[in-house]
Curated annotation (Swiss-Prot):
This is C-phycoerythrin class 2 subunit alpha. The keyword Membrane applies. (2R,3E)-phycoerythrobilin 2 binds at C140. (2R,3E)-phycoerythrobilin 1 binds at C83. Contains two covalently linked phycoerythrobilin chromophores and one covalently linked phycourobilin chromophore. The gene is mpeA. It comes from Synechococcus sp. (strain WH8020). Light-harvesting photosynthetic bile pigment-protein from the phycobiliprotein complex.
Amino acid sequence: MKSVITTVVGAADSASRFPSASDMESVQGSIQRAAARLEAAEKLSANYDAIAQRAVDAVYAQYPNGATGRQPRQCATEGKEKCKRDFVHYLRLINYCLVTGGTGPLDELAINGQKEVYKALSIDAGTYVAGFSNMRNDGCSPRDMSAQALTAYNTLLDYVINSLG
């Protein structure tokens, strides 16, 4: 999985050079933000099930059939379970990104090819956007986590939302 550190080192190595001053500044910034990212990862690990369930509830409140594609889900219970499973999967990848300090886990294990998969399954990505937007708007500092941790978490949610758009 890629992180800022592995990306910087890999780029320098590919160019047969030592990391530059700007490379080192990038790594230093990542290290300085690490405490906030790890706080967000810890809070997410402890609350992922409730976060995913609130997202599912928001999706089904906005889209009663659970999908806005061509084929509404046949069984609301099964659809909700699958929707929650998908949100939990994304939250786990977001957690990995918070730990590594990069978007590699999301890029490699979720974002690449997601639009094609959703289209093939007749699932409108808008349902996921609604759920991720709910997650983003539901987070509160200092109730849930510090402002810096919430920013790190929300940045990754925005990354996912934008990839679906």
